Every structure is written in C-alpha cells, then in structure tokens.
Amino acid sequence: MASTAFVCAEPEGDALPPSLQNLLDQDSLKWIFVGGKGGVGKTTTSCSLAIQLAAVRESVLLISTDPAHNLSDAFSQKFGKEASKVNGFTNLFAMEIDPSASMQDMVESGDDSGMNGMMQDLAFAIPGIDEAMGFAEVMKHVKSMQFSAIVFDTAPTGHTLRFLSFPSVLEKALGKLSGLSGRFGPMLNQIGSMMGGGLNTSEMFEKLESMREVVTEVNAQFKNPDLTTFVPVMISEFLSLYETERLIQELTQYQIDVHDIVVNQLLYPENDSQCKHCKVRWTQQQKYLKEAYELYGEDFHIVRMPLLSQEVRGTDALKKCLLIEPYKAGQVVDLSASS
C-alpha cells in the first residue's frame, strides 16, 4: 500500500532555495556534520545526504559518532568501527565509532609497564583528554582512507559541542605534553629503565607530536568554510528551536560554517481533514516555523521536511527521502518498496 503524508505548504519569502543542493554543488566540501536535539531525524538526514553526495562524489564516508549508533538500523545493515561498503553502492561507506571507546582501545593496545601507566595518568589528568585523544585516533584513521567527502551523524547537541571542542583541547594538551619531551624525556627514560619498563618515551612523544600535527590540520580544516559545514536538524517546537539557536551560536564561536537548516516532521492537514489534533499541532508548528524564518530566513537554506506516515528504513526509502528538491503542497511520498 502506498504511504501518505501531510506535507508543508510553500511559505512565502524564501531568500535562499529551501534545498541542500548547495552542498552537492560545493565541490570543495570535505567535512559535513549533521546534528541537533535527540529524536529530530539527524540520522535520516545524514543518510539521505550521504546518498545524494555519493551520486556526485568519487567516494563518501558516513560516520556515526552517536553512542546509540542508528546507521545500522537506518540502512538495515550492520556496521562497525571499520568502514564498510553500503549495500547497493560502490562508493558509499559507513562506520560507527565511539571516541571514548577508541581511546580505550588505544590504551589497551599499549604495553603494561609502569612507565606506560604513569604517562596515561599524566595524559588523563587533562580534562576531556580521553575522548579528545580518541577523536584524534579516529581523525588519523579517517584521513588515511582518502574519502572525497565525509558526513558525520553526530550525537545529540551537548555531546556534539563537546566533540567539536576536541581539536582545540587536543592542540593545547598535546602541545604541553610534547613540550615535556625536551625537558624530561631523558630523565623519564632513565626512570623507566630503573623500573624495568621497556617504554621509550621519545617514541611516545613522537607519537604525540604526530597526533598533534593531524589534529592541528583537522582543526584548521574545520574552521575553513570551503572545507567544512554543519547542518542543524530541528523540529518546529520551542525546545528544538531554542537548542538549534544555541548550537548555531556555539558553532559561530568555534568558527564552523553553518548555512543550512533542516526543519523536520512538519505536519500539514489536508483541507478536508477532520483531525482536531492535527490542526492544533499544525498551528503550533506554524508558530515556531515562522520564528525560525525570522531568525534564519535571510541567511540560511531552510529545508522543510514532512512528517511521513512510515519510518524511513532501508536504502530504497532513504533514496526517496530527498533533501534536494523542495516539497510541494499536497505532494505524497511513497516509501513502500518498489514492486
């Protein structure tokens, strides 16, 4: 049976096209982050965007940094911490990672000497360094894979803001640790030998310096609007609008570009609808949609997505959940499998 959907009427005064086509046209983009409040449709948006990018780019990687990891559910395909090809594509890959778990893997792969434990304690004394170093390991791994575009399906807003602060945290922390190399490296090597440990601190500091160089490069790329952008996803409610505004202000402080917003789950009752709840909900949504346009209408591409009567799962459904062609009043989206 074909699915039905109430869809958004065409509002007046779009200063910029209500479409993410601009992201496909910007060939220089390397990093695209998708984020927002929990439950607003970040994963569906990031998956759909990655599919559209795969049609115009040589290779695309979709990464989930949300510990909940919904990519596997969205594509109905199991993904892990290594990049795997998405079924039905030759150039789209996906992986699910947890920065803090990545750091734990790095610790467990080290030796068991007392010196190693001491250096871990020294490093972990820096606030946020555990997740940040996990982030660095992920970035180092991702950069080695040479994808032309990388889409991040991020965790809810608070986690995302912390994630985006990692490059700055790491740059400062690794700079301090690397500075210890010249001052205390020989002495720490001697102590390590006395303790019977086989750790060569010069090798450790070389690894830290190498990691710092990667993070410094990534940090510079994140602040370059030609290479990086962030796409907030929201629903037309007070809390979501408030959190989106807070997110955009934080992104501005981090000097991360943002010029697209996806407003998801919009409900527009048909003219002959007898559903009182639908009409009440529609009125509420219109209030906050209007506020969103007042805040962002002149400078942002605001993409309006309808509330669908079916959940978007599987590659076929994700391909139909387009963010490129603006929805028209009365348009029905059929997410059922092709016969």
Curated annotation (Swiss-Prot):
Signal peptide stretch: none
Lineage: Eukaryota, Fungi, Dikarya, Basidiomycota, Pucciniomycotina
Function: ATPase required for the post-translational delivery of tail-anchored (TA) proteins to the endoplasmic reticulum. Recognizes and selectively binds the transmembrane domain of TA proteins in the cytosol. This complex then targets to the endoplasmic reticulum by membrane-bound receptors, where the tail-anchored protein is released for insertion. This process is regulated by ATP binding and hydrolysis. ATP binding drives the homodimer towards the closed dimer state, facilitating recognition of newly synthesized TA membrane proteins. ATP hydrolysis is required for insertion.
Complexes and interactors: Homodimer.
Localisation per UniProt entry: Cytoplasm; Endoplasmic reticulum
Binding site for Zn(2+): 275, 278
Name by which UniProt lists this protein: ATPase GET3
SUPFAM superfamilies cross-referenced by the UniProt entry: P-loop containing nucleoside triphosphate hydrolases
